[in-house]
Curated annotation (Swiss-Prot):
One of its GO terms (cellular component) is host cell endoplasmic reticulum-Golgi intermediate compartment. GO terms for biological process: permeabilization of host organelle membrane involved in viral entry into host cell; virion attachment to host cell. It comes from Rotavirus B (isolate RVB/Rat/United States/IDIR/1984/G1P[X]). The record marks 207-208, 214-215 as: Probable cleavage. Transmembrane segments: none annotated. SUPFAM superfamilies: VP4 membrane interaction domain. This is Outer capsid protein VP4. InterPro entries: Rota_A_VP4, Rota_VP4_MID_sf. It comes from the Viruses. The keyword Membrane applies. Belongs to the rotavirus VP4 family. Keywords: Capsid protein, Hemagglutinin, Host cell membrane, Host endoplasmic reticulum, Host membrane, Host-virus interaction, Membrane, Outer capsid protein, Viral attachment to host cell, Viral penetration into host cytoplasm, Viral penetration via permeabilization of host membrane, Virion, Virus entry into host cell.
Length: 751
């Protein structure tokens, strides 16, 4: 069992089989001692007196045929139809509604007449004393042929299907549904004895419909484990929450937008019980719409919002507290209603505004919409504020006409207009005959939150402890492990994008420079947040463990990492205290709103400290053998003063004594690892690279430094801080650009 708990369940119904656990065939049945259930607990026969026992556990593998079917439960048939096949094993409970898709391939006949595919929903088979009548509903306004009606009815006879011939095949897919959605009713009468059922009435109807929404098809108990197959109805509520960031000189440009990965909790009633459910909606939009003109003045609006357009996909994770997946350690054979579809429409006012008085802050816009349908589902491991463990994942795909106007020459299509969205101007040119460049069909991220709702029927098989006293995690042990961190990553990306936009026009906010002007106050800030910070860092490690990114060949280069080993500071004197480095990161990532409200965002801060920093070492601290090693390929000369390894881009930089030039070389990861290993006895990990150090050292308003003085200052953090405090805003902005680039590189690896 431990092997199963160590492995993470994989999405889309895939599983991982652990060798030596449930698949093991080496147990000796003669030595086994079977547990006996007494008063709800499991005991072993004491009189046997064995000191050790083993249990012959049966492997539970994907693709095995089901066993121990309980014939007292109604089970609609799904599979290929041949003579003798029955569509149900017993009479369905009253109120049962079935959706039946008959897909015919090849030449198939019933009673010597060829039959075609048909999709229907059936709500009853009744008997009036002389004949049986089936009532159904077709998905289209076409009269069903007599042969199609026979195909539907014959399987409900107690004798089963008779009279099917031909070299083709008929595939039947049956699902239990909650309400009839097909509109075109038909009936058919026969005299053969058949299974009958119809609508329920009064209190009985309510009770039976509740039972029909949840059916245990079979339940097998073997020792500690119980295997169940369940079919149930769920209410799915995807939640679409847009976000965006206004930037630029005057906060009039939309620089980023999209949909959050949003967790939504709600309740509904099923079987007379209140079901507490949670969905996590992950939207993957690819479209953009709106005006995009980089030459526009900063006082005007510019920018495109993100659009969920046809062919885009979104996924919805779902879990609840009343299904059999709770406490399950294994799941397989997921099936779901394949007919769910819907439409997302932009509603409400635009959430973005320009930085003017309210009467002038509005932005011309138009919302759009997009249709979507269910495509597939499976199982996934989820980690939210309410639950840690198994969930189902349902995938949806948008469909319709995909459209984007990449110029002003597309004529207006009135049928397409309701789907078009735009921001920054009218979506058509003057005259209304052509779409404006940037018009796109789809659901835009820029309006009110949107919640859709779907009733779905799902089926699955799970393995769980048969003793209710055993627990495997789930709601009782669920914690917010990574969802807040993932949100912090997006928040940090928003802040980086906003700061970069401001830097492009030399209008950096004062929050960036709090780190420079108030360095002396920083150590006290971090004295009381150790526990909070450690929690966030541990959560980031869990998030990294689920990432598909390659492992960096260079380790221990982050500003804070429990594996970082501090080395003797032989290369840099008066080294900047770590609290100062943390302060520069912390205050740089702190928004004006947080400063005004005297609040802190430690999760975002913890994410920022994951960036990889350069290692710097003076050449005179390196061994002779290693210097010769670098000189062979021409990476080091006799005039070099220092070397630097930057794990962000696997670059080796050397500082020349003459003119204080910095030469960069792109090297492979193996060589980077070798260089760092040989530098480990003398290197200094630093927030400031050689380039930043040189730029700071050269900015001295009192005298023009010599190259020798520049080099000396570059390796004296005390002098660097003194100069840094007196830099003007423009110069500090240039230095800060590398710092932001380093964080952006880290975010790409974590996303």
């Amino acid at each position: 069992m431990l092997a199963y708990l160590r492995r993470e369940w994989q999405s889309y119904g895939e599983t991982v089989i652990a060798e030596g656990t449930f698949n093991s065939t080496s147990s000796d049945s003669s030595q086994s001692e079977k547990p006996i259930k007494t008063d709800g607990r499991y005991c072993y026969q004491a009189e046997i007196g064995r000191n050790a026992y083993s249990m012959d556990a049966r492997g539970f593998m994907l693709g095995e045929s089901d066993r121990h079917v309980d014939t007292t439960q109604f089970l609609p048939y799904t599979g290929y139809i041949t003579d003798g096949i029955k569509y149900c094993n017993i009479e369905p409970p009253c109120g049962t509604l079935l959706r039946m898709h008959f897909d015919v391939s090849g030449d198939v006949s019933v009673d010597m007449h060829r039959v075609a595919s048909i999709y229907v929903e059936v709500d009853s088979v009744t008997y009036d004393g002389s004949q049986y009548t089936i009532r159904g509903y077709r998905d289209r306004n076409l009269t069903a042929t007599e042969t199609q009606k026979k195909l539907i009815f014959y399987g409900f006879r107690k004798l089963g299907m008779i009279g099917m011939t031909g070299n083709g095949r008929v595939m039947l897919t049956s699902t239990i549904i909650q309400k009839i959605s097909y509109k075109h009713q038909f009936t058919f009468q026969m005299h053969s004895e058949s299974y009958v059922w119809g609508p329920c009435s009064g209190r009985i109807k309510t009770r039976v419909q509740g039972n029909d929404s949840r059916i245990i098809i079979y339940e097998q108990e073997d020792g500690f484990w119980k295997i169940l197959k369940e079919t149930l109805w769920i209410k799915l509520k995807p939640y679409f929450k847009p976000y965006g960031t206004m930037g630029g000189a005057f906060k009039n440009w939309l620089i980023d937008s999209g949909f959050e990965k949003h967790e939504y909790t709600y309740s509904y009633e099923r079987d007379g019980q209140v079901v507490n459910a949670t969905t996590v909606t992950y939207v993957k939009p690819t479209g953009k719409a709106g005006i995009n003109q980089s030459w526009r003045p900063a006082t005007d609006y510019n920018g495109q919002f993100t659009v969920l357009q046809p062919e885009d996909e979104f996924s919805v994770w779902y879990f609840e507290d009343k299904w059999q997946i709770s406490q399950a350690i294994y799941a397989k054979n997921f099936q779901s209603d394949s007919q769910v579809e819907g439409e997302l429409t932009n509603n409400g006012a635009l959430i973005f505004k320009m930085n003017y008085i309210p009467s002038l802050a509005g932005i011309t816009n138009k919302g759009g919409k997009v249709k979507y349908r269910y495509i597939s589902g499976g199982f996934a491991q989820i980690d939210t504020s309410r639950h840690t463990g198994l969930a189902i994942i349902l995938n949806f795909k948008c469909y319709g006409k995909k459209f984007y106007a990449d110029n002003n020459n597309y004529p207006v299509d009135n049928a397409l207009n309701p789907y078009i969205c735009y921001i920054g101007d009218s979506y058509t040119l003057s005259g209304g005959t052509h779409y404006r460049q940037g018009a796109c069909a789809g659901f835009a991220a820029g309006y009110d939150d949107e919640i859709t709702e779907h009733d779905m029927t799902i089926s699955y098989t799970v393995m769980k402890p048969s003793d209710p006293d055993f627990v495997t995690g789930g709601d009782n042990y669920g914690q917010t492990v990574t969802s807040d961190i993932e949100r912090s990553i997006r928040d940090l990306q928003d802040q980086i994008n906003s700061i970069l936009a401001e830097m492009n026009i030399q209008q950096v906010t004062s929050a960036v420079f709090t780190a420079i002007t108030n360095l002396g106050e920083l150590p006290s800030l971090f004295s009381n947040i150790t526990k909070v910070f450690n929690r966030a860092k541990d959560n980031i490690k869990k998030l990294r463990s689920r990432s598909n990114s390659d492992i960096s060949p260079i380790g221990a280069t982050k500003i804070i990492d429990k594996t970082t080993l501090e080395t003797p500071q032989l290369s840099v004197i008066n080294r900047m205290p770590e609290e100062y480095e943390l302060g520069i990161i912390y205050n740089s990532m702190r928004t004006r709103k947080l400063i005004d409200e005297r609040k802190h965002d430690f999760d975002t801060f913890a994410v920022a400290t994951e960036m990889e920093l350069p290692y710097i070492s003076k050449v005179n601290t390196l061994t002779k053998e290693f210097k010769d090693y670098l000189k062979k390929p021409g990476l080091l000369s006799n005039d070099d003063v220092a070397v630097q390894i930057d794990p962000m881009n696997n670059r080796l930089s050397v500082l020349r004594r003459k003119y204080a030039d910095i030469i960069e070389y792109k090297i492979d990861p193996e060589l980077a690892h070798e260089v760092l290993s040989n530098m480990s006895n003398s290197a200094t990990r630093s927030l400031f690279s050689l380039n930043v150090r040189k730029q700071i050292a050269m900015n001295n308003s009192f005298s023009e430094p010599t190259f020798s003085q520049i080099i000396d200052r570059m390796f004296d953090d005390g002098q660097l801080i003194d100069v840094l405090n007196n830099l003007n805003r423009e110069t500090a902005t240039e230095l800060f650009d590398e710092f932001l680039t380093r964080i952006k590189s880290m975010l790409v690896k974590m996303s």
